[in-house]
Amino acid sequence: MTLHRFKKIALLSALGIAAISMNVQAAERIAFIPKLVGVGFFTSGGNGAQQAGKELGVDVTYDGPTEPSVSGQVQLINNFVNQGYNAIIVSAVSPDGLCPALKRAMQRGVRVLTWDSDTKPECRSYYINQGTPAQLGGMLVDMAARQVNKDKAKVAFFYSSPTVTDQNQWVKEAKAKIAKEHPGWEIVTTQFGYNDATKSLQTAEGILKAYSDLDAIIAPDANALPAAAQAAENLKNDKVAIVGFSTPNVMRPYVERGTVKEFGLWDVVQQGKISVYVADALLKKGSMKTGDKLDIKGVGQVEVSPNSVQGYDYEADGNGIVLLPERVIFNKENIGKYDF
């Protein structure tokens, strides 16, 4: 081999290695963070996110804390930023607790989005939102009203925590709707299970024991709703209406046994998928604005809405909300059609 030919081969090899290195560096990496791992709702959202990653050819990592805490989510956010991830999508346990970490991430060029539970809007670009507070709060009250067929009733609210963004927004709207449309309903208590299955069951049983004449439990939380249903079965209480939000796979046995007549949710698999598609579009296009539309395989078209649909005053370029196309009410007739 001549020296000239050796140098040529060496140069081509070096260029090839450099090209491979550039391709590896250019590959998008998106982190998808739940409030905590080990809950079917969040696992299903993660499955949708990873499905979208395969369709788009991007690397999606699903990981979260084992307990719902600001410190646990902040640690993950910082780790993903330090590892060079291009985008972070997080279901926030607090509206403001994650903001310092998320703002640092944005300063380093990381795209920050929220899903399921929002931060303050200035701490992210877009929120992939299951529904407005008015939509979801109204849905909760309407489900209860279909079963509580009297003017005077006693109602309890039961969900994850007093600080979580999404559920408190829904409950605020639900309580306002009750005051306006069902003034004879008395809200006797509002209690929390803190995303812990054991504590949620204990709390639900405590509510039913303390209020033996309770007419309805409204539980807009993936842990609280099945806990309320199990508590009613444990205490042989078949008079209380139990409604709220959780996944069909978790609630199926309670619906089949008649403990729960109906409950609601949205397709959380689609929510995870939409989240990654929006993040990918941001990474490729650079920005999106209110009114922009995005076609998503297997879902349809979604649109960027202003933050005002969520009741926020904050508006800025490259900032807004993407609403899921629809929400679902599950009952004995249709629950068999869903698997998540």
Swiss-Prot record:
One term under GO cellular component: membrane
S-S pairs: none
A Pfam family that the UniProt record links to this protein: Peripla_BP_4
Any GO BP annotation: quorum sensing
Signal peptide interval: 1-26
Compartments, as annotated in UniProt: Periplasm
Record-linked InterPro entries: Bact_Solute-Bind_Prot2 (IPR050555), LsrB (IPR030159), Peripla_BP_I (IPR028082), SBP_2_dom (IPR025997)
Chief subcellular location: periplasm
Keywords: Periplasm, Signal
Induction / repression: In the absence of AI-2, repressed by LsrR. Induced by AI-2, via release of the LsrR repressor. In the absence of glucose, induced by cAMP-CRP by direct binding to the upstream region of the lsr promoter.
Domain of life (superkingdom): Bacteria
Record text on subunit structure and interactions: The complex is composed of two ATP-binding proteins (LsrA), two transmembrane proteins (LsrC and LsrD) and a solute-binding protein (LsrB).
PANTHER family found in the cross-reference section: ABC TRANSPORTER PERIPLASMIC-BINDING PROTEIN YPHF, D-XYLOSE-BINDING PERIPLASMIC PROTEIN
Role summary: Part of the ABC transporter complex LsrABCD involved in autoinducer 2 (AI-2) import. Binds AI-2 and delivers it to the LsrC and LsrD permeases.
Record family assignment: Belongs to the bacterial solute-binding protein 2 family.
The protein, known as: Autoinducer 2-binding protein LsrB
Taxon lineage: Bacteria, Pseudomonadati, Pseudomonadota, Gammaproteobacteria, Enterobacterales
